[in-house]
Amino acid sequence: MTATLAALGITPEALAANGVKLGVKLGDATPFSFDALIERARTMAGQPYTPPATAPADILAKIDYEAHGKIKFDTAHALFADGPGQFPVTFFHLGTFFRAPVRMHVVEKGAAREVIYDASYFDMPADSPARKLPDGTKPGSGFAGFRFQESRLGDQKKLDWKKNDWVAFLGASYFRAIGELYQYGLSARGIALDVAQAGKPEEFPNFTHVWFDTPADNRADSVTIYTLLDGPSITGAYRFVMHRTKGVVMDIDTAIFLRKDIDRFGIAPATSMYWFSETAKGTATDWRPEVHDSDGLALWTGSGERIWRPLNDPPRTMASAFGDNNPRGFGLLQRDRDFNNYQDGVHYERRPSLWVEPLEGWGEGAVQLIEIPTDDEIHDNIVAMWVPKAPARAGSQYRLRYRLHWLADEPYPTPLARCVATRLGNGGQPGQPRPHGVRKFMVEFKGGRWRSCRLV
């Protein structure tokens, strides 16, 4: 191993020095590259799935919502807290709702070293059940996820980096980012498998390993990570290049390999929450006028057509498909930015929009929208994703490149007016008999060339 590292231009002394600077314990160095990670995922796809080892279930059960909330990562142990790069990394702890450990690594000059879990990285009560979890590299030990904190550099600070983060990976293959309004909201996933598919349970593969590229430049506004995806039906290797600029922009390069057939194979999925809005409140009993992280699905088709589909809380699970060929983009957007329309201190008016931009042709398929009934804001009940027309069968391989924009609005807005609200009511005229089965739609447009239109 020493000879291999020497060939890479890395000395054991330099790696040890980095371990001290990083503030965490690091394991032995091993060669790493994205190409090798892709081959690892390819090899795994030809082998039976092995579930990851987890910590003792009785201990995890005691780290419930309340106990988990008392466990805070000590920023003195943050990766890159003193550089290189602008953005330190902190970690989430395991618990009842996040049982699968994720193995974290630091990469420098082609060599990776694992970040060894230690309870001392976290501030927790003396009687916390988390203190009984195994340390080091024992089966079931590890972290649940991670966050990139805001810039540590004085002239770049948007907010105190020790208290504020801008991207988080936590649970299965879920991740999310704040937009330009400094607020978390909807989430993305590495992949979506058989969402709301009749007769089949949805599968949630995990990002089991993460590698953090050591930044080369203190002034860089981007970070690079690599992840390994593993599940009963799938494996995958992902590279994320994430830019902290106006909002957050992520360039994603992934290679995916299927172990089993998938009936609804969702690429670049976005997951959100919609309960009610001005469109229809239904039977929701709530003092607020609107409750949602997103209010519509926007599409820019391969032929250049713009489509806006308001979201709905349906009486039963609904699936809508918008057929297309080489789509230019789609996303779940939050267009209503008026606090008065929400009246809530959690600031739904600041939730980010998420736009998916393919960076190459995706061929034929459909943007599918899944809407699931909900009676509370705590449930994510909306999924939007690209589903290829060709069947996803065992042995299939996919190489995909796309960009995610976490902004207040879509990155390529139409010059025309856009729909910002849709209201439904009974048809007919006030004071007159209402015709049966007739609905009235009031659609509100804003901006663009609308002001120059004449009403006739």
Locations of regions flagged by a protein language model:
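N-terminal export signals
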Residues: M1-A17
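Solvent-exposed N-terminal domain segments of exported/luminal and surface proteins
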Residues: R42-A198
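A contiguous, surface-exposed recognition patch within enzymatic or periplasmic domains that forms
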Residues: E66, N164-S173, A177-E180, D263, ...
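Residue-level recognition of well-ordered beta-strand positions that form the cores
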Residues: H105, Y226-L228, V241, D253-F257, ...
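Extended, loop-rich substrate-binding clefts of extracytoplasmic carbohydrate-active enzymes
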Residues: G185-H243, E360-D375, H379
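Acidic, contiguous internal or C-terminal segments within carbohydrate-active enzymes
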Residues: T227-M273
